Design a protein with these regions (language model features):
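Second-shell loop/turn segments in exported
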Residues: 47-55, 69-79, 145-153, 173-188, ...
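Extracellular/luminal Protease-associated
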Residues: 78, 127-227, 396-398
């Protein structure tokens, strides 16, 4: 039979795994495993095989391409999001999960509509822009005004007497996301306090090639709502150069953005039942919604598919872990966190399972080259997890930092559940974040598979451990 090596290993990869696991389950080594160890020898061996399987898998990456190309961006309230969710549920059913279901969640429904901005003085220029998520529109008309540039909220206060009737541009260099994003989130509130008619930000990004970046923004009761949008870093710097030359800057803005009534969406939940402690849960996942530009491949299609693929590989191994592995793909992380909040409340009040949520894992930092995980929990649990970390040295993903989590597992962590977030090489994350550049082609198959391997090792390791992860 004339077949390639890749075809041979793809076709026959299950046979040696099942045979080897059978031998391991009946080996003297397994029977004499160290009773004080968090992981048995058999669990460690299964983890090793899961890692190897993850590194050669093609299905997960192909599914990420399918999600990205056929459904694209998936903003809460959109048909694309619900169509993607239905496709995922159908595929999960094929994978052999013991239970797959959709959990209803009401989510915000903001629609961007048509929008544009132009620089009118001192030159004529189209300004690539994106309205920020939750912003109002311009009331069906073009809004024009003189621009006042500020570099911080303190600078805004210092110039407050010059603000009334003008458009405020926050031109703040990117330092860290946490420091810089405040101008996106709160910029409209602060500018409106002093009489601005609209506000812009230089996009929250570490690098730009004339790409504006969107993201959530907020209003505050009692303060007028004004349109709030992002322009590119390049255009913000251009405007600053004109201002330094003494030029007056005038901009026109048109936005059709609207907020509609809440819409029905869903969390996706899939389970592998535990063989000994089925009520004890290891949760892993990401958020299935995205912003309404690009494909949402990096943020967070990759995180969702990586968690799903990690669980699928556990099914494929034929070894059922002692505890239940639950994949949760949360809806509405980007502009409301409704999916995560609803899941945590449901787990606490309806399922009554918070105490049996052993560990919550999240991947929402891209699926670039993995470094390991950041963990928030007890010192004893940290030491237990270190046994798993050491199994990931061959792919350079053995880092286990103290402190970690994620937005979607945050509500669970606030209720006492230990949490951990996947850490990756993040240099390019904010190049693409919340922009039209977040597309599948930015991702690398090898990096993705290593992320899957890292997630699978922790998910199976904790689920099959001899001891319950310490609180």
């Amino acid at each position: 039979m004339n077949i390639s090596l890749s075809t041979f290993f793809s076709y026959y990869r299950i046979v040696p795994i099942v045979c080897l696991l059978f031998l391991l389950n009946h080996s003297t080594i397994a029977q004499n495993s160290d009773s004080t160890s968090f992981l048995s020898s058999t669990t460690k061996q299964t983890n090793t095989l899961l890692i190897q399987q993850a590194l050669t898998s093609t299905l997960g990456f192909n599914r990420l391409a399918h999600l990205s190309d056929y459904y694209g961006h998936r903003l809460s309230g959109s048909e694309e999001l619900e169509q993607a969710i239905d496709w995922i549920v159908g595929e999960m059913d094929k994978d052999g999960f013991d239970k797959v279901w959709k959990q209803e969640v009401m989510v915000p429904h903001w629609v961007r509509g048509q929008e544009y901005a132009t620089l009118n003085a001192p030159i004529q220029k189209d300004l690539p822009m994106l309205g920020l998520g939750g912003s109002i529109g311009t009331g069906g008309k073009v809004m024009s005004g003189q621009v006042i540039m500020v570099h911080s909220f303190e600078d805004l206060i210092a110039k407050k007497d010059s603000v009334p009737g003008k458009i405020v541009l926050f031109n703040v260099p990117f330092t860290t996301y946490g420091q810089t994003v405040q101008y996106r989130v709160n910029g409209a509130i602060e500018a409106a306090k002093y009489g601005a008619i609209a506000s812009f930000i230089a996009s929250v990004a570490s690098y730009s090639m004339q790409t504006p970046h969107t993201g959530v923004m907020y209003y505050e009761d009692g303060i007028p709502k004004i349109p709030h949008a992002a322009i590119t870093i390049e255009d913000a710097l251009l405007i600053e150069r004109f201002i330094k030359r003494g030029e007056t800057i005038e901009i026109s803005l048109y936005m059709e953005a609207q907020q509609f009534d809440d819409a029905l969406s869903h969390n996706v939940i899939a389970e592998i039942n535990g063989s000994e402690y089925p009520d004890e849960l290891i949760v892993l996942g990401g958020h299935i919604d995205s912003w309404d530009v690009g494909q949402g491949a990096m943020d967070d299609g990759g995180g969702c598919i990586a968690a799903w693929e990690a669980a699928r590989l556990i099914i494929e191994s034929g070894i059922r872990p002692k505890r239940t592995v639950r994949v949760v793909l949360w809806t509405n992380e980007e502009n409301g966190l409704r999916g995560a909040n609803h899941y945590a409340e449901w787990a606490e009040k309806e399922e009554n399972s918070i105490q049996n949520h052993i560990l919550a894992m999240e991947s929402d930092a891209g699926v670039f080259d993995p470094l390991g995980f950041g963990f928030s929990g007890s010192n004893q649990a940290y030491q237990q997890l270190n046994e798993i970390a050491q199994q990931l040295t061959d792919i350079d993903a053995a880092e286990l930092r103290k402190g970690g989590g994620g937005a979607d597992i945050g509500p669970l962590m606030n209720k006492g559940v230990p949490g951990m977030g996947l850490n990756v090489e993040s240099e390019k994350y904010f190049w693409y974040h919340h922009s039209a550049a977040d597309t599948f082609d930015k991702l690398n198959h090898e990096d993705f598979n290593e992320c899957v391997a890292t997630i699978a090792a922790y998910a199976f390791g904790v689920a099959d451990a001899e001891l319950r992860l310490a609180r």
